[in-house]
Design a protein with these regions (language model features):
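A residue-level marker of the well-folded mature domains of exported/periplasmic proteins
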Residues: 2-5, 9, 14, 23-301
């Protein structure tokens, strides 16, 4: 096995060498699109709402989003809820609606719970987009998807199959139980697993939630090892979770291995195909590209 990192360039996400379109686009030149975006962004205020503070994954995209909008003459306010919950995001949205923003771009903590507040924003004339984790289609005008749900799930299932040697117990360490993107990936993983005999010797023993908090993710990793003595692989489709699990497994010399979605900068010391490293390989797309594409999409609404 070798380390594999997934990369996306603006309008596509690459999964195991396959380019998957994530947003329809016309054939205009980059210069034309930039000029159009610049005209529409001039003097506009845009709010970017994250799932929670302290997530380096989102911060990379947020920085790219902000730089792109500001380069086109707009202003960005990046806002984080107090906790990674829908209720906390609703409080943030309630405050933003009263501040005369032209647009809101959000990574949602729940598929349906934000609908009333986001519909209120749109009724007030605020443009609403989303990226990374989508609210339902009635809650926004467009969603910029970093990669296809099935493609992400397929890559993760194949990694579990590979790292486990094709059989044995594995578990999933996710973000929050309401997280739209993680839940979609996990559901797709289960569907893929049930529909193909090559996964028949794998057993998904548990799905646990670290709420994208390092300590809780560490505690959940420890609990998995305690509860499942024969656990061979943990799959963490969350950058916070995978980093916490990688450190715990490696520090404790666990034979259980890890894969999932992680940031190279956070996973470098834990990644290697040998007994000394907890994670043989992991995946991720280009968060800077995702932030830039989301910015241009939002200011074009």
């Amino acid at each position: 096995m070798k380390k594999k990192v997934i990369s996306a360039i603006l309008c596509g996400a690459m999964v195991l060498g396959t380019v998957c379109p994530v947003l329809a686009a016309d054939d205009k030149s980059e210069d034309t699109k930039t000029e159009a975006a610049g005209n529409s962004a001039e003097g506009k205020k845009i709010a970017l709402v994250g799932k929670a503070a302290g997530n380096a994954f989102f911060e990379i995209a947020a920085k790219s989003f902000q730089e792109t909008v500001e380069a086109e003459g707009g202003e960005v306010q990046v806002v984080y809820p107090e906790t990674a919950t829908a209720d906390a995001q609703i409080k943030v949205l309630d405050n933003l609606i009263s501040q005369d923003f032209d647009a809101i771009c959000i990574s949602a903590n729940d598929v349906n719970a934000l609908q009333a507040k986001l519909e209120e924003a749109m009724d007030e004339g605020i443009k609403v987009s989303s990226f990374d984790s989508a609210p339902n289609k009635d809650s926004r005008e467009i969603f910029v998807n970093q990669a296809g749900t099935k493609e992400v799930a397929q890559a993760l299932m194949d990694a579990v199959l590979d790292i486990s040697g094709g059989e044995g117990q594995f578990a999933i360490l996710s973000a929050t139980s309401q997280s739209a993107n993680q839940n979609a990936w996990i559901d797709a993983m289960k569907t893929i697993m049930e529909g193909d005999d090559k996964y028949s010797k794998l057993e998904l023993v548990d799905v646990v939630y670290g709420d994208d908090e390092p300590q809780k993710s560490t505690d959940q990793t420890a609990a998995l090892l305690q509860n499942y003595k024969d656990l061979k692989v943990i799959c963490a489709p969350t950058t916070v979770g995978i980093a916490a699990a990688a450190k715990y497994l490696q520090d404790n010399g666990s034979e259980c291995k890890l894969t999932g979605l992680g940031l190279p900068s956070e996973m470098q010391e834990y990644t290697g195909d040998d007994a000394d490293h907890s994670c043989p390989y992991f995946y991720l797309w280009d968060m800077q590209g995702l932030g830039k594409l989301s910015a241009y999409t939002t200011i074009s609404l």
